[in-house]
Amino acid sequence: MYRRLLFLFVILIGWQLAALSAFREGWRRSVSGGVPADTALIDRNITLGEVVVVGRRKLIELSNDTTLINTSGLQIHRGANLEALIKKIPGMSYDRESKQLSFNGKVLNGVNINGETFMGNDIASALENLPADAVELLKLYNMLSELEKMTGVDDGAEDFVLDIKTKDSYNGSLVGSLAADHGSRGKRLDEAQANVFNAGGENLSLVGRSDNLSSMDVGRGNFQNMLMGNVVKKLGKRLTLTGSISTSTFHNETESRSYDEQYLASGTKYQGSSALTAGRNRSDFANFSLKYKIDDRTLLNISANGSRARTTGSSATTTELYEKGSAIDSLTSSTLQTSTGGRATSYYLSTDFTRRLNKAGTSISLKADANGNSDHSDNLSLSQTRYHRLAGAAGGDSLLLRHLYQLTPSHQRNSRVSLRFTQPLGKLLRLQAGYGLVYRKTANARDSYDYGAPMRPRVDSLAGESRLATRGQELTLRMDYKGRHWTVNGGVVVEWQRRSIGQRQGFRSVDSTLRAVEYKPTATAKWRKGKVSVEMRYDGYTTQPSLSALLTPVDVSNPLSVRMGNPGLKPSYRQRLDVRVEHEKYGLTLSGNYSNTFNDFAEEVSYDNATGARTYHTVNINGNRTVEGSLRWQKQLGAFLLSGDGRAFLRHDVALSNESSQSVAARSETRTVDGSVNLWCSYQPKWGYVGLTADWRLSRSHNRLTDTRVNSIDYGAGISGDVELPWGLEVRTDASCRLRRGTYATAADDQWLWNMTVAWSFLRQRQATLSCTWNDILSRRNDINRSVSAYSYHEIYRPQIRSYVLFSLKYRFNITRKQ
């Protein structure tokens, strides 16, 4: 039945797009004397720095280590934002939930406009608010800091950004929009924005928005309000000021149901939960930076940012623990209600001063930075736990009632001062040495009060304070070689630490001093010749155990999930090796990586067979490793864009579990094999857009402790299209399906989506648009996620807002400055 439905949808949408495009083409021929007016790509001369491309413009080009994306051939609807534009670029992907933007597997850390930072590198704000029509060219590259540019030495940290070159018609003009979207199920959006861009990098932006479209979770009163602004101002040729500010408020209520299977030596244990959570957050953020080129040999950089937030929340959770695959044989049942509140602040200050000592490039740099945060939270919890295997005083099930109020303030402060000396050896090689002083301090506390007893006494056994102070010295050695075909960069940072740890719980206090050494080696080698490039990269770093992992007081607010610290933890060392090969002519990218961790931090789970309660404490463990490989291909054939990618991922996870019947913890190992294939095709003529997608995802896991195997296979397909019609009319539609198959999947997990928009643009320059959108026409939206770890199998389902209609009115303006 579902295959027939899918077939009918594909035929219906394909027929609709074909009919509309035929009508559009016939009308165009009638007004142009029978000569087709559409052409996918425009012949023109393009000047890109020192690179000149003559003839038909390619979508994606490479210039040294910069990827250039020419967007003139991409067709987007009127009033589209930057997010709608990047969806039509092969290899570009954006995850709305995680706010992560990537291109061909490389994660992008920020968005620039004409070479300058926009909105403090807030990717979501840039994608949702920048008008796509203002974009002339997209550039992707590893952005060096001003200090790295001045010294000529890369510090080894990758910082890939998306840099937007705006069209000349937008530069110097005031452009913006006013929008109001309102529809059924209470969905709405009201927005106003204004932008001023300049080719030299100066920009000014102001955005205000109130909406609830970003969340599809079922809940009452969900919304987000935000106001943000950004400014870049250049005072002469030597001084650049950048600032951004934002304030936001949101409320989110979510329902969820989850299911878990925990891997134990005596067999698999099961857990089912349902929860209703609600939270409200108010946050403010400000960012400022100054770049002052005092003279040709002297540079000063200053940057600062700060934030504050206030949160309130509540939750109600019901949990059932049982030993067999049926909730009828219940081991323990519980309800937990919580009410939370908190406030948090953070700050960051950084400055560096560099002076070149001669024309060869010898330089000395002084850098200082400081950052910190504080968090004050309170939690009121009421739990009722019924143990069906334990007898109470009256002979029935044992019942535990716990009503606790907890205050948990925490503070963290970090500072660093370093001096670096850079010496060129010839024109291609530079060496750098640095020495620095480091200071870090962390303090955590918890006060617990028994609200179930008269007078609400303080519970000393659940209260305590802990602190960690680290004083260190660091030595930095780096080299940077830039040749015709080779670029080699590498170095190591060694930090000698003296760690003072203290804890007080009740009348008992403990103080100790430890000495440790941290290593952070990095090495990168790139080779490029013609259309081929090869890159190898190694990263490693030592991580000391956090204060919370070392000395967290026992937390029993949830009797079925108790957490405690482990003062015997050792530092861990993580390393990763990446290899990447690109061939521009054939559009191929081959990449792979391997990573593993020595003395990794993992939680040992102690399981009580009588109650089902779990106690977690952090331990060191070895055996966690991953291997990943991917192959990507893309090709442009006139107005057609084709791309595909395949990915394989192998993961080996290790955990420890201990049951009340065991004297030694059992080692739980889980091997997971993931694979995926994605195919993408689009046709982008002048009259619109047609896109086809298909994907296949495989995941197989095997837990050796219980010999449990979990398999899942997802199939996905989609079609989308935009058609421009006469008289300012436009039709947009998309349909997709997600078929989930495997060990736990059923047909009810499948998702079928079909959305359609009809828009009419009017006024003299079509600057106003009235549209109607029907979202999720089939009312088959689903949100279910499954995952496997060394501890357990986990799945969670969140009910979604389904079919709704949205009416929109948007007005765009472009006010050009008179010459």
Predicted regions and their residues:
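Sec-dependent N-terminal signal peptides
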Residues: 5-13
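Conserved C-terminal beta-signal and adjacent last beta-strands/turns
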Residues: 676-698, 706-819
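Extracytoplasmic loops and strand-loop junctions of Gram-negative outer membrane beta-barrel proteins
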Residues: 121, 175-177, 268-274, 329-337, ...
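Membrane-proximal, glycine/serine-rich, low-complexity loop/turn segments characteristic
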Residues: 21-50, 56-316, 336-378, 418-440, ...
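Outer membrane beta-barrel strand-and-loop segments of large Gram-negative receptors
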Residues: 416, 458-464, 474, 564, ...
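Signature of Gram-negative outer-membrane beta-barrel scaffolds
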Residues: 404, 430-528, 537-538
